[in-house]
């Protein structure tokens, strides 16, 4: 859900989840600060100092999502999440001890060893486009577990739909586009082809 809704405690009064509301608010606030700090560090590593992420990624545009993956006897043939890249700037993921997250590297799927005491940071499509390809959005998936259910929580650093994404270096690898345009193209591709095409749609050479 959008982070701004988590800050609205009235959302939880009907369910009497006051303690949950407080915990989620603290968690979302902490992850938001961490995400902005990481975005700043990554951009400064490229020699680019900017308030861009502070100005575009606000509480009403970022998301916190809690995921539950039921046990599945057909595992690993059944995915909890199909292979994809994240359509944001940064994702901060916390997973339990069950495991199931896999990243693709050199054409092979590599399992990420679960560590409940650690956070996983994913570069998203928007950061790849903004950094002009310096940072890469890695394809990942979730495989189910035969015997145990899996839980994870993800924070997505997202801009408003009207935010223009432009490469910060010249010559640009990707053309300028808004977050709304990107999301609409992803949805259209999934509808027409059954999968996300993503950033290749926005390469300068493709237009």
Where are each of the predicted segments found?
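Non-heme Fe(II)-dependent double-stranded beta-helix
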Residues: 1-27
């Amino acid at each position: 859900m959008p982070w701004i809704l988590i800050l609205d405690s009235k959302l939880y009064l009907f369910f009497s989840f006051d303690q949950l509301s407080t915990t989620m608010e603290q968690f979302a606030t902490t992850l938001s600060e961490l995400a902005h700090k990481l975005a700043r560090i990554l951009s400064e590593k490229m020699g680019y100092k900017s308030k861009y992420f502070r100005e575009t990624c606000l509480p009403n545009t970022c998301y916190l999502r809690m995921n539950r993956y039921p046990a599945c006897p057909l595992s690993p043939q059944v995915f909890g999440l199909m292979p994809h890249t994240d359509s944001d700037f940064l994702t901060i993921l916390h997973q339990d001890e069950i495991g199931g997250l896999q990243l693709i590297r050199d054409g092979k799927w590599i399992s990420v060893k679960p560590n409940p005491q650690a956070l996983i940071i994913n570069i998203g499509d928007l950061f790849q486009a903004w950094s002009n390809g310096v940072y890469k959005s890695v394809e990942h998936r979730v495989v189910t577990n035969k015997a145990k259910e899996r839980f994870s929580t993800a924070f997505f650093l997202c801009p408003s739909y009207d935010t223009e994404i432009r490469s910060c270096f010249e010559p640009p690898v990707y053309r300028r586009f808004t977050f709304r345009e990107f999301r609409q193209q992803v949805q259209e591709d999934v509808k027409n082809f059954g999968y996300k095409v993503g950033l290749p749609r926005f390469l300068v050479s493709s237009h």
